[in-house]
Regions:
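Anion-binding and metal-coordination hotspots
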Residues: 2, 8, 70, 78-90, ...
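Hydrophobic alpha-helical membrane-insertion signals
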Residues: 2-32
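Short, solvent-exposed coil/turn linker segments
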Residues: 20, 42-45, 159
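Basic, short loop/linker segments at the boundary and entry of helix-turn-helix/winged-helix-like folds
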Residues: 27-71, 76
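Helical catalytic core of nucleic-acid polymerases
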Residues: 42-44, 53-58, 63, 87-100, ...
Length: 512
């Protein structure tokens, strides 16, 4: 029986004619799309920073190549600068994008760090590209949030109560070690004479001093945050008393008391947070977004349970899937027809309720206003309902956690004629509240149908980002940096939606 022949295999065979780089990738590959997109992006902010440097020295890599490299890496779930650098050797598509150059991982990390703000700003351009392609319909937007792990361990966080206890304990340990060192010195002086072979400060003493310095620094920062939070509360209370003092309908004694209280509260606030004090680091990446406020007592000191993380002080311990994690709260506003993210923010405030107004408002400022919007119960508040109504948004916000197929419980509104027996003597009932109107709207078949769509709009986006592309933890630390990184991640998500749409259109044209 004749032996089976094999196809030729000569992996070390040189090419007589060098192959074209595009011959290595199939037609319609994502790498081609990324290069086409980068050619259209406005990168003047990045180029301006590079051109401002001294022309002497190492020649930099082309900024469009570096941006394309990062976009493709993020699109394929590669976020580590070391892995991206290795991929320029191991991955054919990455090698093609890099033009067979191999930036060091330090170069990739530095480029991302220096141009992080400009890279995050690419999100707006990605949304505009999706708009131009007809992917953003703005008929139905869905708002949702998810917890993204911080680049820090929750075990690196310490409460204010623990800080104070550890500060005293370590100070006592340092004192005991110094006493032991002095005793050792006295023994050596008696044996060898003064000044001979004095013992060095033990390494354990240096470790404790270093640990003590870190705890004291974190303690001061936590106290400063609490002071500013309490000062803001006092100033808000003082403003309320000013309104009372200005109301001429009130008795003179009450107005005088209000003026005294306002003055006292402002003096206390200025003592805790001087108006001309130095600027503070941290806080929200955007002044319009909610940010975590350190709980403070009446005297401005932190509460016992107030915490601060030593590795990433801006991150907070939050609850995700029933467990406590060190994380940030990432928010997206998603188009219902294409799952394109039209607005993306991140902050360190765990509850979702305060995000609705600033996130939707930011989208509206860029001309992205929905006629219908859905959100889960985490965003339910009278303030949010009234704001949506005043801005012409038909909102569907769940009143309580429920399955998407579950029918909301019937609620009798104040004006329901079936609520009470008809009576000519019955006084006119007040109009239903915004919450009652929302319950009634969600109880209708149309309301249930619209709200059920939320499950297929925002939630799959988080699945694609966190599971398909494995972005579950930020690579960077600090609120401003993770905000830009989240914008970059969402920009890549939108570009992938645009890529998928183009591929479908090509397939349809071929089939037609």
């Amino acid at each position: 029986m004749s032996q089976k022949n094999y196809r030729p295999w000569t992996p070390e065979q040189d090419y007589l004619i060098p192959p074209r780089p595009r011959d290595w990738l199939p037609e319609g590959h994502l790498a081609y799309f990324i290069l086409d997109v980068v050619a259209q992006l406005d990168l003047r902010r990045i180029e301006a920073v590079i051109q401002a440097k001294d022309p002497r020295g190492t020649v930099p890599y082309h900024p469009r190549m570096m941006v394309a490299l990062l976009l493709y890496a993020y699109a394929t779930g590669t976020y580590s600068s070391r892995r991206i650098a290795r991929a320029t050797f191991d991955d054919v598509a990455v090698r093609f994008i890099a033009g067979d150059t191999h930036p060091h991982f330090d170069t990739i990390a530095a480029f991302r760090q220096v141009h992080l703000d400009a890279l995050g700003a690419l999100f707006v351009q990605a949304v505009q590209m999706c708009q131009a392609a007809g992917l953003v319909k703005l008929g139905h937007l869905s708002l949702d949030g998810t917890k993204i792990l911080a680049n820090a361990s929750k075990h690196a966080a310490m409460s204010y109560e623990r800080m104070k206890a550890d500060e005293v304990r370590i100070q006592n340990e340092i004192q005991a070690l110094l006493e032991r060192a002095k005793q050792a010195d006295d023994v050596e002086d008696a044996q060898l004479g003064p000044g001979q072979d004095v013992v060095d400060v033990p390494a354990e003493l240096q470790r404790r001093e270093s640990r003590l310095a870190k705890i004291q620094e974190a303690k001061r920062a936590l106290e400063g945050d609490a002071h500013r939070h309490r000062a803001a509360e006092l100033r808000e209370m003082a403003n309320t008393h000013d309104e009372t003092a200005a109301d001429e309908r009130l008795p003179a004694r009450q107005r005088k008391t209000a003026r005294t209280l306002a003055r006292t509260q402002r003096e206390k606030a200025d003592e805790l947070d001087p108006p001309d004090g130095p600027p503070t680091a941290g806080g929200s990446a955007d002044a319009g977004l909610p940010a975590h406020q350190t709980p403070a007592l009446a005297d401005g000191s932190p509460t016992a349970k107030s915490q601060r993380n030593f590795t990433d002080p801006d991150s907070r311990i939050m609850v995700a899937h029933g467990e406590y994690v060190q994380a940030y709260n990432a928010q997206v506003l998603v188009d219902g027809d294409s799952q394109v993210i039209v607005e993306a923010v991140v902050s360190n405030q765990a509850p979702d309720v305060e995000y609705l107004v600033p996130v939707v408002q930011r989208a509206m400022e860029r001309g992205l206003k929905a006629t219908t919007m859905t959100a889960d119960t985490g965003y339910m508040s009278t303030k949010n309902l009234d704001w949506c109504q005043n801005n012409g948004i038909d909102a569907y916000i769940s009143m309580a956690r429920q399955r998407h197929s579950e029918v909301p419980a019937a609620v009798v509104t104040r004006r329901d004629p079936l609520a009470v027996a008809e009576s000519s003597s019955e006084p006119e009932r007040p109009p239903p509240t915004s919450r009652e109107r929302m319950v009634a709207k969600l109880a209708t078949p149309e309301g249930r149908k619209i709200y059920a769509r939320r499950k297929t709009i925002a939630e799959p986006v988080f699945g694609q980002i966190k599971e398909a592309r494995r972005f579950r933890r930020f690579s960077l630390r600090g609120l401003w940096k993770v905000a830009s990184e989240w914008s970059l991640v969402c920009a890549v998500h939108n570009l992938l939606k645009l890529f998928s749409s183009k591929q479908k259109n090509i397939a349809l044209s071929v089939a037609g």
